Structures are given as structure tokens and as C-alpha cells.
């Protein structure tokens, strides 16, 4: 008998998707009613995922592995999805005809990413990543004035399909070398074969698909255009929840090499350095806040890679911690964008002028989120960078850590430009007051507390990430 209890979170999101599909068939359902049901269902999904955290086992002929590592990332996915849906009380940037489809595709994408982090076999990985990717391809062009932004959707689709083709090609190389597609078998056989060119090529090509999702240089070209072209709500989802699944799979697949190939490690070091440097330098000249955060995400993919490439328990744990920290910090910034640009427009940095007067709470949330991304204590971002750099130092990557610290210093410049606009600049013209309802206030206070608490008292969560790292095969 199959252990269906191991599949409870995924079954819940599958049923949730069916509900939204039924809602999409009826055009009489008001957006307010749809939103309330979406929040309730997303909250239920988060609860179901948290309750399933201690489940362990294999299902679907061992193609699906449930352990603490996968369950922790599922909680991050469910949390990110809940936050995004909770903050979507007004879907101003999305065509009113597609509000039900927005919730449907968001749910299906979350389902695909949950399947991805538990996938224990390469073809299951491929099917899962395609399920999540095609949902995102459809979400991006849903913005109002689609004729203007349809180019963004097409570009995202074409680059994504190319990345998927590379990944499938890499899987064929791995199968040809190792004669298996099961991850536990690859863990045993691939380290001894990793010095063979075919094995290295296969692993690198497979990782290309995940690097694309993570926006790691040079697989980043879609990110700035998609962040700008998609509706604010869709961009928030792409920048937060979808990055969790990519991080989970990069960690899992990098560890397949077992650290036996110096060439493979050097490639990862190069990608980390290029991502940090390119992302931070190009972010300096940005005027659009979403585009700035897009280049920031490229840099943060590089920071995360520092922990991953150590291929140690501490390195993996630090990368997991950094992923969770990034989810909280990035969502805080994008929530402010959604609330300030409540008509669905893209937000220029100069439009934040005087935000501390129009909405002191949102200004504080944005400031702490940016301080965290910059790695300033006592925020969760500082602790995340400290753990990542410490793990790299333990493995002797001193030069890499120095480069990372230099890049973190560079990032201070453009993050402080945004904070300066919110707190020190006077608006060039009168901007409307920012409407902050009770639920937004509660969410803002919660994010502020979380960003500081996890930064000052990280011990419990660090212990959880270390336990998750130990559960990896």
C-alpha cells in the first residue's frame, strides 16, 4: 500500500488547483470573494505542509523521496505562496478576466516545485520543473496591456525552453555514464566517475536548468526583463517562492559530485564570482526598483553558491539558511512595491521619495529588507552571509570570501540609494497617500520581527538547517 500520507501537501495543492480551475469557469465570481477563498486555501496549504514536516519515506517506486530536507523547502514554498496570495487583495496589475487563472497557475506552480524538491529520479525532476515552469510562462503575460508586455513572456518562454533542453541533454549524459537515473544510485556511482568528461558535461548541463531558475550568471538574461514586464504580484512570486525550488535542486545536484572533481568546483567558483560581481555592478545604475532587485537576485545567487560549492554539511546548512533569509527579505521589499504602486505600475526609485511620511511602516519594512539584503547586522541577511562565508573559510576558500565581502560592500551603495529616497528625499510632485489596511500592517510587523529575530537568535533555525543537510543522501 502506497504511503499517501507522505504526499499530503502535494495532494492538498492539487485539490486547491482543482478548486481554482472550477472558479475560472465561472465569470460571476467576484474578485473579493475569490481572494478570501484563496487566502483561506493558501493558509490551509501552509498548515498541511508544516504538519507533514516530520514525514520520511519513499513513494512512487522510489522516484519520490520525503525527508526533512525536502519538507523544509516545501514549508518555505508554502510560506512564500501564502504571503504572495495574502498580499494580493487588489490584483490591479493583472487583467480582471484572469484573476482566477492567476490563483490557479500560482497553485499549480507551487505544486510542481514541491514535487521538484522531493524528486528522487532525474526524469521526475524534469517533469516537475516543466510543470512549474509552464505555469510561470503563462503568468508573466497576464499583465494589463498584454500587447506591450507579451515580448517579455515570449522571451521568458524561449530562454526557459532552451534551458530545459540543455538539462534534458545533460540527463542523457548522466544516464549514459552512470546507467541509472535514481539519485541514491548516482550518489554512490557518480563521484567515482566525475573525472570523466562526459560526467562533468552531463552534470553541468543538468545544472543549467536550475541555474536558469536561480538566475545565476550567465543564465540571468531573462530576470531583469521578466521582473519589469510581469505584474508586480507575479514578479513577487517569481522572486521569492520559485527561487526556493531552484536553490533546493542546485544543492542536491552539486552534492552528487562529492567534491571529487577540481574542475567542476572551479566552474562553480567562477560562476559565483561572476554572479556576485555582475549583479552588483549593473544594479548600481538601475532606476526602476524591480529591475534593481532583479540584478540584486543575480548577486544573491552568487552568495548562495559560495555555501553550496563547499559541498559540506555546514555549507549546505548555510545555503538553506540563506535561502530562507532571502525569501523573507525579498518578499518584504516586493510587498512594499505592491502596496506603493497599488495601481499596478512599475515603481521608479524616485517615486519612493517621502515614503516615510506617507507610510512610516512600509518605509521601515523596506529599509529592514534592504539592510538584510546588504548584510547589515542585526538582520537575518547578516547572519546568512556570515554563515555562508564561515562555511567557505572552513574549506579554505579565503579569496572567494574576500571577493564576496567586497561585493557585499558594493551592494551597500545601491541599497542605500533606495533607503535615501524613502527617508531623505522630498518628492518632485505630490504622490497619493499609501493605503495600508489592517492585514498589511500585521504582515509588515510580522516581517520586521522575523527579519530581526532570525538575525539575532538564529540558533534554532540553524540547528534545523543542519539536520536537513544531514538528511541529504
Swiss-Prot record:
Subcellular location: Cell inner membrane
Reactions it catalyzes: a quinone + NADH + 5 H(+)(in) = a quinol + NAD(+) + 4 H(+)(out)
UniProt keyword Translocase, yes or no: yes
Keyword Cell inner membrane part of the UniProt annotation: yes
A family per Pfam: Proton_antipo_M
Topology within the bilayer: Multi-pass membrane protein
Transmembrane parts of this sequence: 5-25, 33-53, 66-86, 102-122, 157-177, 199-219, 226-248, 265-285, 292-312, 318-338, 362-382, 399-419, 445-465
Main location (coarse class): membrane
GO molecular function: NADH dehydrogenase (ubiquinone) activity; NADH:ubiquinone reductase (non-electrogenic) activity; quinone binding
Family: Belongs to the complex I subunit 2 family.
Role: NDH-1 shuttles electrons from NADH, via FMN and iron-sulfur (Fe-S) centers, to quinones in the respiratory chain. The immediate electron acceptor for the enzyme in this species is believed to be ubiquinone. Couples the redox reaction to proton translocation (for every two electrons transferred, four hydrogen ions are translocated across the cytoplasmic membrane), and thus conserves the redox energy in a proton gradient.
Database matches in HAMAP family: NDH1_NuoN_1
Protein name, per record: NADH-quinone oxidoreductase subunit N 1
Amino acid at each position: 500500500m502506497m504511503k499517501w500520507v507522505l504526499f499530503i501537501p502535494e495532494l492538498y495543492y492539487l485539490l486547491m488547483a482543482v478548486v481554482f480551475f472550477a472558479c475560472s469557469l465561472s465569470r460571476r465570481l467576484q474578485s473579493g470573494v475569490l481572494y478570501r477563498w484563496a487566502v483561506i486555501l493558501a493558509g490551509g496549504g501552509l498548515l498541511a505542509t508544516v504538519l507533514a514536516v516530520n514525514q520520511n519515506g519513499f513513494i512512487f517506486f522510489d522516484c519520490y523521496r520525503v525527508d526533512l530536507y525536502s519538507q523544509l523547502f516545501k514549508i518555505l514554498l508554502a510560506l512564500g505562496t501564502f504571503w504572495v496570495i495574502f498580499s494580493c487583495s487588489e490584483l490591479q496589475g493583472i487583467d480582471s478576466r484572469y484573476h482566477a487563472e492567476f490563483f490557479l497557475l500560482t497553485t499549480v506552480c507551487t505544486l510542481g516545485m514541491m514535487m521538484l524538491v522531493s524528486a528522487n529520479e532525474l526524469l521526475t525532476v524534469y517533469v516537475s520543473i516543466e510543470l512549474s515552469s509552464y505555469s510561470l510562462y503563462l503568468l508573466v503575460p497576464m499583465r494589463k496591456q498584454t500587447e506591450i508586455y507579451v515580448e517579455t513572456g515570449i522571451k521568458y518562454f524561449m530562454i526557459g525552453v532552451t534551458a530545459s533542453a540543455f538539462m534534458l541533454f545533460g540527463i542523457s549524459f548522466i544516464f549514459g555514464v552512470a546507467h541509472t537515473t535514481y539519485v541514491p544510485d548516482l550518489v554512490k556511482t557518480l563521484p567515482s566517475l566525475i573525472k570523466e568528461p562526459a560526467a562533468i558535461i552531463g552534470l553541468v548541463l543538468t545544472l543549467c536548468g536550475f541555474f536558469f531558475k536561480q538566475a545565476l550568471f550567465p543564465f540571468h538574461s531573462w530576470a531583469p526583463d521578466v521582473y519589469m514586464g510581469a505584474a508586480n504580484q507575479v514578479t513577487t512570486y517569481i522572486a521569492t517562492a520559485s527561487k526556493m525550488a531552484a536553490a533546493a535542486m542546485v544543492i542536491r545536484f552539486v552534492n552528487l559530485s562529492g567534491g571529487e572533481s577540481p574542475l567542476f568546483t572551479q566552474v562553480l567558483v567562477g560562476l559565483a564570482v561572476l554572479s556576485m560581481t555582475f549583479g552588483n555592478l549593473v544594479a548600481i545604475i538601475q532606476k526602476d526598483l524591480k529591475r534593481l532587485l532583479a540584478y540584486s537576485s543575480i548577486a544573491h545567487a552568487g552568495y548562495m553558491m559560495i555555501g553550496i560549492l563547499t559541498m559540506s554539511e555546514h555549507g549546505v546548512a548555510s545555503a538553506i539558511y540563506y535561502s530562507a533569509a532571502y525569501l523573507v527579505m525579498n518578499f518584504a521589499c516586493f510587498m512594499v512595491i505592491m502596496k506603493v504602486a497599488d495601481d499596478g505600475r512599475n515603481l521608479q526609485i524616485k517615486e519612493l521619495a517621502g515614503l516615510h511620511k506617507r507610510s512610516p511602516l512600509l518605509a521601515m519594512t523596506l529599509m529592514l529588507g534592504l539592510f538584510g539584503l546588504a548584510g547589515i547586522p542585526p538582520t537575518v541577511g547578516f547572519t546568512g552571509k556570515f554563515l555562508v562565508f564561515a562555511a567557505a573559510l572552513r574549506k579554505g576558500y579565503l579569496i572567494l570570501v574576500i571577493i564576496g565581502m567586497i561585493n557585499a560592500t558594493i551592494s551597500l551603495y545601491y541599497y542605500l540609494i533606495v533607503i535615501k529616497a524613502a527617508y531623505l528625499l522630498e518628492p518632485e510632485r505630490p504622490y497619493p497617500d499609501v493605503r495600508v489596511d489592517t492585514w498589511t500592517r500585521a504582515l509588515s510587523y510580522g516581517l520586521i520581527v522575523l527579519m530581526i529575530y532570525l538575525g539575532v537568535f538564529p540558533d534554532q533555525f540553524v540547528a534545523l538547517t543542519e539536520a536537513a543537510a544531514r538528511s541529504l543522501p
